[in-house]
A protein has these predicted regions:
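Conserved N-terminal beta-sheet scaffold of ABC transporter nucleotide-binding domains
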Residues: 25, 98, 135
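Conserved ABC ATPase "signature" region
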Residues: 78-98
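ABC-family ATPase nucleotide-binding domain "signature/switch" substructure
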Residues: 12, 51, 56, 64-67, ...
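Conserved post-Walker A segment of ABC ATPase nucleotide-binding domains
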Residues: 1, 5, 15-82, 147, ...
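ATP-binding Walker
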Residues: 8
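Helix-loop segment at the mouth of the active site in Rossmann-fold oxidoreductases
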Residues: 41, 95, 101-103
Length: 186
């Protein structure tokens, strides 16, 4: 997990990890699981190894199914159902139109927490080795957050990074990086 106050540099770190920005000093490198001794400088070419769930709602206008298939166009019904379950979005199957429920731009018609869980399901379908969640549980109640974190942390052979203000998220992480802003005694 990466924690820090607003303005401490969490967003900058995300931008560096995704090679959307370049460091003014030093360099960002990535090592392969197969060849940990080999380190490559991060470039936009590494971005395909990441799945990123940003803070807030990122759903598109269309059906829930269409939004999920953006993560994996060839996903089967079984894979979609599993991703919804893993992201605590089982509620989708109880909606009158289920996966064919329409949502407007920014997930209109759904609560913020529901839209966030669908975005997480889409990320799980994308199936990349590094999963980056930026305040992805902020709109969830504590019980749903707990279950979601347990489900995500059962994912095997992935690097999972949570950017968060919520210390409860840190309880599920092997390592916690505290970023201190200016004037905080870096």
């Amino acid at each position: 997990a990466v924690v820090g106050e607003t303005g401490a540099g969490k967003t900058t770190l995300i931008r560096l990890l995704l090679a959307l920005s370049h460091p003014t000093e030093g360099r960002v490198t990535i090592a392969s699981a197969k060849h940990p001794e080999r380190r490559d400088v991060m470039t936009h070419l590494h971005r395909c190894n990441f799945v990123y769930v940003p803070q807030g709602n990122t759903l598109m206008s269309g059906t829930i199914r269409e939004n999920l298939l953006l993560g994996k166009p060839e996903a089967t019904e079984e894979q979609i159902t599993e991703a919804l379950h893993q992201s605590c979005a089982d509620f989708v199957m109880s909606l009158p139109d289920g996966l064919d429920t329409m949502c407007s731009e920014q997930g209109g018609g759904l609560s913020e927490g529901q839209a966030q869980r669908i975005a997480i399901a889409r990320a799980l379908l994308r199936d990349r080795p590094v999963m980056l969640f930026d305040e992805a549980t902020a709109a969830l109640d504590p019980e749903t957050e707990r279950q979601l974190l347990q489900n995500i942390m059962q994912t095997k052979q992935k690097t999972i990074i949570f950017i968060t203000h919520r210390m409860a998220v840190c309880d599920y992480c092997q390592n916690v990086l505290h970023i201190k802003g200016e004037g905080e005694g870096q």
